[in-house]
Amino acid sequence: PFARCFEMKEACYAATPAIQLAKDYLAQRPNEKVLVIASDTARYGIHSGGEPTQGAGAVAMMISHNPSILKLNDDAVAYTEDVYDFWRPTGHQYPLVAGALSKDAYIKSFQESWNEYARRHNKTLADFASLCFHVPFTKMGQKALDSIINHADETTQDRLNSSYQDAVDYNRYVGNIYTGSLYLSLISLLETRDLKGGQTIGLFSYGSGSVGEFFSGTLVDGFK
């Protein structure tokens, strides 16, 4: 019982600041560990546009100073903008969604955070073995990737497009789980793609309202 336990809420983004907070905490307490649980239920009305995407699930992640799977890099770039694209008012069973606006906000948030990330850290798409996205539905991340991939060489385009399909394999079966969606995609990638220690994975987290964050992690040797 002698542990600190609290909840973070920010739409589909909440697990990412929880992980970043855990990372900062462990920088001062390297012998500790932090358990982050990303859990939610995406439920929509019958015959609504969101009904085919709905899902429920959770992803539990142990954050430690000596990771055995993925080492988070100190390179996160967040982008925030006031957008009323998705909300669930108190007392409402289902969320209210401005679908077209939400798609545009997602892609803009990705482009802005990625472009600033690339500028700050002098990176290109060729530096990544794969990119993982928040996946409200499986084509959403692909749309975001398509918006920047023409800047990459053909080999990089083929690799990122192919690895994206591996990364959303589990999401196709589970559906949208909101804040755990990005991390379910990461699990899917790690279990279905032939990756090696030392390779870099790019991650894009998004939450309506809105905030997006692009960051990366390096696979640990022997992570399999």
Where does each model-flagged region fall?
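Phosphate/pyrophosphate-binding loops at sites that engage ATP/ADP/AMP, CoA/4′-phosphopantetheine
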Residues: 111-129, 189-194
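Condensing-enzyme catalytic core mediating Claisen C-C bond formation in acyl metabolism
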Residues: 48-108, 215-224
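Conserved beta-ketoacyl condensing-enzyme motif
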Residues: 1-16, 122-148
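Glycine-rich beta-alpha junction loops
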Residues: 41, 67, 76-81, 134-139, ...
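Flexible, glycine-rich active-site loops centered on histidine and acidic residues
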Residues: 27-60
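Acidic, glycine-rich active-site loops and adjacent beta-strand->loop/helix elements
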Residues: 9-15, 38-43, 66, 205-210
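Catalytic phosphate/nucleotide-handling subdomain of diverse soluble enzymes
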Residues: 187-224
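Conserved catalytic cysteine-centered active-site region
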Residues: 1-33, 150-181
